[in-house]
């Protein structure tokens, strides 16, 4: 296929298929793996220089919509009905989204009868497309590494902004989830990377028991250290303790643990292998 692909490794646990509409993401998340992917544009640059370039702007991939139309048409002809996640290596709702490509992509999914799975840190920027996301039968997902800004005080917001400087605030993401729920769109959360296990557990408690917009599905991961700082954080966390505490919270709220990767079912949660096997 031309732009839709089958993820490998850890990403395959999230969805059977994925599509990255853009290159680059100005959310500037320190844990972003996008800059580590192969890209001829980074030739001659240090990793730090390339990270700055990657996080400076969002660029549409050449002919992304035409390629998506072609792939969806081919999948329809093969009766391949697997859902497609948007996006792993970029964000479908960056602050500088060019030409509203994501909305056009969702229209293509609806036209061809495929279910899109959104994963974003753009918060309420995504709400403008909820009409078409619902029509396409899609899911709305967001990444969470921290608790809502107002619950742990100003320090929480400062901590989040240090890691995700230009992403939507956690309260904005919470508001987006509530609006999606009001539209009748299934809502899910990707709870990783875990920077502070207490915040992650507090988030699970709040979001799994929320009376207005209880989440439909959770995918739980950990933190995989990639530099001195994140390796130190990873080493400092008791992952089996975190995993079992998270399971207890979700089971107590009525969620069933599922073990098939890439599945989205209402009332369930999935623990990624890396966290499941952590010792």
Question: Model-derived features: where do they sit?
Answer:
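N-terminal [4Fe-4S]-dependent radical SAM core
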Residues: 1-83
């Amino acid at each position: 296929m031309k732009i839709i692909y089958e993820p490998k490794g850890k990403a395959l646990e999230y969805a059977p298929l994925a599509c990255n509409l853009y290159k680059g993401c100005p959310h500037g998340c320190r844990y972003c793996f996008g800059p580590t992917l192969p890209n001829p544009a980074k030739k001659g640059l240090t990793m730090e220089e390339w990270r700055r370039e990657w996080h400076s702007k969002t660029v549409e991939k050449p002919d992304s919509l035409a390629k998506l139309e072609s792939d969806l048409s081919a999948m329809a002809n093969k009766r391949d009905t697997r859902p497609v996640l948007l996006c792993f290596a970029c964000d479908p709702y960056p602050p500088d989204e060019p030409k509203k490509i994501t909305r056009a992509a969702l229209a293509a999914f609806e036209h061809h009868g495929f279910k899109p799975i959104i994963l974003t840190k753009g918060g309420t920027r995504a709400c403008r497309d909820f009409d078409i996301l619902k029509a396409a039968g899609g899911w709305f997902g967001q990444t969470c590494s921290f608790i809502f800004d107002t619950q742990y005080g100003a320090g929480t917001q400062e901590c989040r902004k240090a890691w995700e400087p230009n992403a939507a605030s956690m309260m904005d993401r919470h508001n987006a989830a509530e609006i999606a729920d009001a539209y009748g769109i299934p809502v899910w959360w990707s709870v990783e990377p875990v920077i502070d296990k207490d915040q992650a557990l507090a988030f699970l408690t709040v979001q799994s028991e929320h009376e207005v917009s209880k989440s439909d599905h959770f995918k739980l991961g950990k933190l995989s250290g990639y530099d001195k700082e994140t390796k130190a954080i990873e080493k400092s966390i008791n992952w089996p303790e975190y995993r079992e505490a998270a399971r207890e919270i979700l089971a107590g709220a009525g969620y069933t643990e599922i073990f098939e990767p890439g599945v989205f079912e209402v009332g369930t949660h999935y623990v990624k292998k890396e966290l499941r096997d952590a010792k």
